[in-house]
Amino acid sequence: MKAIRVHEFGDPEVLQLDEVADLTPGPGQVVVRMHAAGVNPVETYIRSGIYPKPPTPYTPGSDGAGAVEAVGGGVSRVAVGDRVYIAGSLSGTYAEQALCTENQVHSLAERAAFAQGAAIFVPYATAYQALFHCGHAAPGETLFVHGASGGVGIAGVQLARAAGMTVIGTASTERGRQLVAEQGAQHVVDHSAPSYLEEAKTLAGEYGVDVILEMLANVNLGKDIDLLAMRGRVVVIGNRGEKNQGTVEINPRAAMMRDASIIGMTLRNATPQDLVRIHASLVTGLANGTLQPVIGQEFPLAEAAQAHRAVSGEKAYGKVVLVP
């Protein structure tokens, strides 16, 4: 089979298309014939060497969707031919096949395209964990989403609207703002405008914003507290810059006066119990149509380098996927 592998860390060009042996499942394992693989920003950080480095060569990717091709002994949750989305993989998903444990594959509704299945796990699980497990979001509250036209941003908007929240989202392009509005955000602002935070504050009303999903903390975090309502929460999902280059200053007194919380999160810290709740929500949302991942760009597997450049761009629009 063909697979993208990283033999050394560096720029996107290190993503190399290799011919490797087909995969065989062991006990409790499943081989999935890949129809689409999701591309996430974290994979660009690992590839470049600024995150913990896996042994090389390795195949990137933890998101994907396809059909079960083979199962190992003891597998009972899925059968050959089942449509599934992948939430983690033993072998990586930038490939024609992926090896997974039985618990890493989940039912993909017939109404969802494979590309949408490849776009569900990391963005939607991250948004769910940030909103409900870390941010303790509740119906009737107001959510502010920085960069709402990207994969996690869209997920946050859809999940929040389904939960009965008021949503204010940002995007820097007209196309992006239209997309955010189409996902159900009641208010959308242009975060390239100098006064966009003042506009957001006005839209939030006298009480302010209850929860902020922060995708670019090194740029925005110092200003976020001024938007918060009493006991408001900022959940930090993203921060760019190598090691200590992403530091910011905040006003502790502003946080004190609001009883505000700043909460960092990463999906890798989700507990098994968290993941059970997350996947129950995702499977149901895909089946009933309340969750509809938006695909921004599709690339052939051989163009993984271009896909990494696209997902690293500043003007996010939907999810980037690879098609083997």
What is each residue range found by the language model?
Residues 1, 273-324:
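C-terminal hydrophobic helical "lid"/dimerization subdomain
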Residues 21-38, 48-92, 215:
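Glycine-rich beta-strand-centered segment in the early N-terminal region that forms part
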Residues 161-223, 273, 280:
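Adenosine-nucleotide cofactor-binding segment
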Residues 219-291, 324:
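Glycine-rich phosphate-binding loop and adjacent beta-alpha segment
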Residues 120-194:
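Mid-domain Rossmann-like dinucleotide-binding core that forms the NAD(H)/NADP(H) cofactor-binding site
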Residues 77, 86-147:
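NAD(P)H dinucleotide-binding glycine-rich loop of Rossmann-like/cofactor-binding domains
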Residues 93-95, 172-179, 246-252:
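Short, glycine/polar-rich helix-capping loops at beta-to-alpha or helix-loop-helix junctions
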